[in-house]
Amino acid sequence: MSMKTATIHRPGTLPFVRFCGYFAVIAGLLGILAGLRLIDKNPNLAELLYVAIDLCLLFAILGWHLHQQNKVGSVGLAGFFLAFTGTGFIAGPSAKIFGFTAYSLGIPVVALGLLTMSWCALRRRAIPGWILSAFGLSLAIMILSFYLPWLYQPISFFNIVFSIGFLGLGYTLIKEH
């Protein structure tokens, strides 16, 4: 009788990156649901949805980095650290740091990290350009929504466009790994 041994895959190998791709797809689908603002009337359910999205985003960002780590160098690594750390701020408790909420500190850190990762990916053609455009457009929509509230009410165009980017990222990670 022979025993089959389990294959152990370390992070950065193909199955793990594909696994992270599924989390990117889940984050994208849940983000679109959040963007449609159908559950905003139930604050507990809305909070649970955003926690699930943020946790999925952590895996999605990790998978994205592992997918392109050999192509983007130290600048790409810095972008990953910023995006991952900023998402941790957003997903974590709403503590105040230097008078600011963790969420308000996390958003610009995530944005800077994702823009850096996108710029590196674009230069090295590591991810399809339309995905990177979705991230850039979502940042522009987020900034404009401070001045044009109709971009956020009754639906969040930022969430929808941002989430479409993660759907595409997830599809790419799954397809290529």
Where are these regions (language model features)?
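Hydrophobic, aromatic-enriched alpha-helical segments typical of multi-pass transmembrane helices
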Residues: 2-177
